[in-house]
Amino acid sequence: MAATSLTAPPSFSGLRRISPKLDAAAVSSHQSFFHRVNSSTRLVSSSSSSHRSPRGVVAMAGSGKFFVGGNWKCNGTKDSIAKLISDLNSATLEADVDVVVSPPFVYIDQVKSSLTDRIDISGQNSWVGKGGAFTGEISVEQLKDLGCKWVILGHSERRHVIGEKDEFIGKKAAYALSEGLGVIACIGEKLEEREAGKTFDVCFAQLKAFADAVPSWDNIVVAYEPVWAIGTGKVASPQQAQEVHVAVRGWLKKNVSEEVASKTRIIYGGSVNGGNSAELAKEEDIDGFLVGGASLKGPEFATIVNSVTSKKVAA
């Protein structure tokens, strides 16, 4: 289904009606949060400004490189994945982007052995502790053994189809981090929660579960994926996505630290494709994407990676 922009969710134009648990100060100030953070958070990458691209710098609220992950989910065969790898290997990708793909577990070794080193590998899930008698699960140690550097945790399909709870997901993140994997920490609300004005409450509760469990945010990327936009063809407008990203950054500042808020990359997912990624990328607090279906098409995924160019401003 072709993606269409959802500029106003049905019967509700905002994100919140009545939600006592959300700090009032955070609500009133979240839209101006970016203007209060230190200008040093506007970076090309972790390198010094003397190495900036002559085309300009990347203006984004999270420090580090633009981040694009491809979640292949439960898709593919050996042959189709070989074709996808070939397309990715031949693609021209912007240098100032961290690129990660997440194949089904059974194909990770195939991907790792033939995919360009330019692209890192992620698991789609991991167990909450050391491996053992846990039928059907995948351990962090196994992912590392196959060369993975990241793992996706808290994806809505794990939360709402498999039934994983916030606290359990937080513990999984803590274990993965303790063993040296980076975590793509997913949060996001369902349509009925957005319509009820609970977007912030839901996202903040999911964030809190991560914050309560993890020892550090140094190797975490937060992925905001509104459930109503995943695989539906509906896409949050750039303004809708930006509003939530700013609120998430504000929550991190208030509840974790200003340093974590300024450093953490917050990426968007939910029917991102080659046609809408450039407009989404222009928003200052959208630090990249977590891509589903479009990541199964090599040329389109490359277009999404290269949408970082729309984020560049004159130095």
UniProtKB/Swiss-Prot annotation:
Classify the source by domain of life: Eukaryota
Q: Which Pfam families match?
A: TIM
Q: Which residues form the active site?
A: 155, 225
Q: What is its EC number?
A: 5.3.1.1
Residues the record lists as binding substrate: 71, 73
Give the record's keywords alphabetically.
Calvin cycle, Chloroplast, Isomerase, Phosphoprotein, Plastid, Transit peptide
Q: Name one GO molecular function term.
A: triose-phosphate isomerase activity
BP GO terms, sorted: chloroplast organization; glyceraldehyde-3-phosphate biosynthetic process; glycerol catabolic process; glycolytic process; primary root development; reductive pentose-phosphate cycle; triglyceride mobilization
- Its main localization is plastid
Q: Does the keyword Chloroplast apply?
A: yes
Q: What stretch of residues directs this protein to its organelle as a transit peptide?
A: 1-60
Q: Which CDD domains match?
A: TIM
Q: Which GO terms describe its cellular component?
A: apoplast; chloroplast; chloroplast envelope; chloroplast stroma; mitochondrion; thylakoid
Which compartments is it annotated to reside in?
Plastid, Chloroplast
Query: What else is noted?
Result: In plants, there are two types of TPIS, cytosolic and plastid.
Q: How does it assemble?
A: Homodimer.
The name on file for this protein is: Triosephosphate isomerase, chloroplastic
Q: Which gene encodes it?
A: TIM
